[in-house]
């Protein structure tokens, strides 16, 4: 068992918030993202973001400029290395798959974006341009809940550990050695050596906005626990992966045209659902720059 989110309080006066599950995710209405946001409305959006970790706004037919402007309310926009940008807007990157593409869908494993960087993204702001009537959902899970549901003994065991991250399985040497290649509509050709570069982050981090602790591991970018042998590290990481991805820690968002979604990249994992073969799907995203994760 784990604690569900508390019922909505009276603090939301400028926006309407409808939770998606008892763990994370909320729909926000009563706001027009095409217009500048006053401080009171923005503070409520930020409050909902820190509370629900994943928030989405239906029916927001925003332009690229408005997409960028809204994203900058969360912090500086800093595109990730792997994705192509749309013409004329380097800050806006594409998640696009043609109906006839047959390569692997990018992001189809549970992961946190770009943890191979020294300062991974803080948040991602994504909007749906053209999506299938059904299929192509995105799943999210709460790394707060994953941490909070560990036993006190396990928490004490892992809280001081660090994990080595790299992109070797995504565009480094391990990726080059496998056959499961991503389709190339959205993905840049990346330098293999850059993919093999390693960085180290704490296994448990404290969110600077909410003050809550969360696990910070994912099977896409994590290579090993620092200072352990593979025989010691692998089973512990595997346990944490399996624990974090429990179904009751998740939510699933169904995309609709003109929907804008923001996820907190420090305290969640997400994955694409590759169930829309033969259908065109096009979303754009901006990435909010982060700081080095810390305990």
Curated annotation (Swiss-Prot):
Catalytic activity, EC: 1.14.11.44
InterPro entries reported in the protein's UniProt record: AtsK-like (IPR051323), TauD-like_sf (IPR042098), TauD/TfdA-like (IPR003819)
Name of one Pfam family that matches: TauD
Binding site for Fe cation: 111, 113, 270
Superkingdom of the source species: Bacteria
Annotated 2-oxoglutarate binding sites: 138, 255, 281
pH effect on activity, per entry: Optimum pH is about 6.5.
Residues at the site labelled Contributes to enantiospecificity: 221, 285
Coiled coil, from the record: none
Pathway assigned to this chain's UniProt record: Xenobiotic degradation; 2-(2,4-dichlorophenoxy)propanoate degradation
GO biological-process terms attached to the record: catabolic process
Entry GO CC: cytoplasm
SUBUNIT field: Homotrimer.
Protein name per the record: (R)-phenoxypropionate/alpha-ketoglutarate-dioxygenase
């Amino acid at each position: 068992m784990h604690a569900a989110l508390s019922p909505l309080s009276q603090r939301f006066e400028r926006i309407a918030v409808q939770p998606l599950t008892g763990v994370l995710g909320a729909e926000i209405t009563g706001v027009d993202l095409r217009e500048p946001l006053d401080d009171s409305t923005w503070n409520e959006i930020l409050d909902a973001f820190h509370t629900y970790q994943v928030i989405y706004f239906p029916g927001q037919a925003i332009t690229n400029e408005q997409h960028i402007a809204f994203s900058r309310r969360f912090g500086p926009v800093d595109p990730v290395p792997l994705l192509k940008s749309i013409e004329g807007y380097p800050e806006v990157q594409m998640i696009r798959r043609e109906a006839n593409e047959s390569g692997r869908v990018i992001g189809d494993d549970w992961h946190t974006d770009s943890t191979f960087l020294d300062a991974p993204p803080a948040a991602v702001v994504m909007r749906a341009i053209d999506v299938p009537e059904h299929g192509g959902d995105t799943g999210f899970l709460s790394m707060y809940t994953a941490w909070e549901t560990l036993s006190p003994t396990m928490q004490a065991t892992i809280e001081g550990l660090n994990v080595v991250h790299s992109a070797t399985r995504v565009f480094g040497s391990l990726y080059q050695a496998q056959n499961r290649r991503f389709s190339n509509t959205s993905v840049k050709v990346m330098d293999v050596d850059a993919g093999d570069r390693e960085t180290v982050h704490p296994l448990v981090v404290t969110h600077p906005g909410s003050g809550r602790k969360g696990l910070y591991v994912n099977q896409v970018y994590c290579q090993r626990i620092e200072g352990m042998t593979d025989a010691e590290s692998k089973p512990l990481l595997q346990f944490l992966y399996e624990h974090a991805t429990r179904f009751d820690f998740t939510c699933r968002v169904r995309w609709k045209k003109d929907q804008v979604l923001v996820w907190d990249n420090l305290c969640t994992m997400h994955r694409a659902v590759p169930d829309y073969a033969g259908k065109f799907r096009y979303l754009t995203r901006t990435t909010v720059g982060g700081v080095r994760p810390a305990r």
